[in-house]
Each structure stands twice: as structure tokens, then as C-alpha cells.
Amino acid sequence: MPFFYVPGVGLSTLEQKLTEMITAPVEALGYELVGIEFIRGRTSTLRIYIDSEDGITVDDCADVSHQVSSVLDVEDPITVAYNLEVSSPGLDRPLFTAEHYARYTGEEVTLVLRMAVQNRRKWQGIIKAVDGEMITVAVDGKDEVFALSNIQRANLVPQF
């Protein structure tokens, strides 16, 4: 199961440490750290999402990967074997912070909840508002309110 970086919401010690270590090198290269996922498994994966006003290229990802790898090699915060992936958020951009939800107000989103609300864990609708640690999503014409701490995963729905 993936672990997501959401400032102030359920961060483990490892995720806090990774965020602290990764943010400065990413920002020093001129990119925004959108979020991180640490997916535990047979071969674990540390996935880093970056963005910039000009978009992200493969070369940008390679630069960030090289810089972050150097930091992780020295600090060695992860005790299991893992793969490092650096990518843009893509069309189905994951949302990690309240600021991300606010930035994409009016956009369609898919949410997967940690705990079911009205016997449902998966929801899809339009982001209407963000109020502190709560978001309002219009689902089938009705406003539903979700706590950010209950959102396991959120992605924008690409519009073609």
C-alpha cells in the first residue's frame, strides 16, 4: 500500500525525514516538490513527483533523480532495497495538499478514501471548495465533504 506525503496529515517518521531531505535539493534545481509516495513491497519504490511552470521533461527528471540519489546515498534513510522514480504529475495529477485541491477547484477528481463514507471508498466529482483540512466535492449534483486525513489517494480526471 502506498504512503503519501501530505503535510501534517499522518506522516510517519520516515516520510517526514524523506520530505525534509528531498525538498531542498528539488527546489534548488528550480522545481516544486508536488509529493512523494513510498510503496513498500518485494522491491519498494520511492516515487517523487516534481513540477514547474514550464512543465517537466525527461532531462528534468534525470537531473532531480541524480541530485536526490546523492542525498539519499549519504543520508541512507531507507533500510530496504528500493527503486527511485522521478516524474511529472501527469494528466491524472495526484493531489497531496490542501493547496493542490484549492489550485484545482472546479476540476474533476477521483478520491479513494481510507475509511468508507456512506459505504463507499471511491468517489468522483468536481472539487468545489477547500476549508482547512476539509474538501467539498460535488458528486452527482450533491456536495460531499471529506477530511484530507481520510483521503488515501486523489487524482485529477483528465479531460479530453
From Swiss-Prot:
Its main location: cytoplasm. It is found in: Cytoplasm. Keywords: Cytoplasm, Ribosome biogenesis. Signal peptide: none annotated. Coiled coil: none annotated. One of its GO terms (cellular component) is cytosol. One of its GO terms (biological process) is translation. It comes from the Bacteria. PANTHER family: RIBOSOME MATURATION FACTOR RIMP. Required for maturation of 30S ribosomal subunits. Belongs to the RimP family. This is Ribosome maturation factor RimP. It comes from Cronobacter sakazakii (strain ATCC BAA-894). The lineage of its organism: Bacteria, Pseudomonadati, Pseudomonadota, Gammaproteobacteria, Enterobacterales.
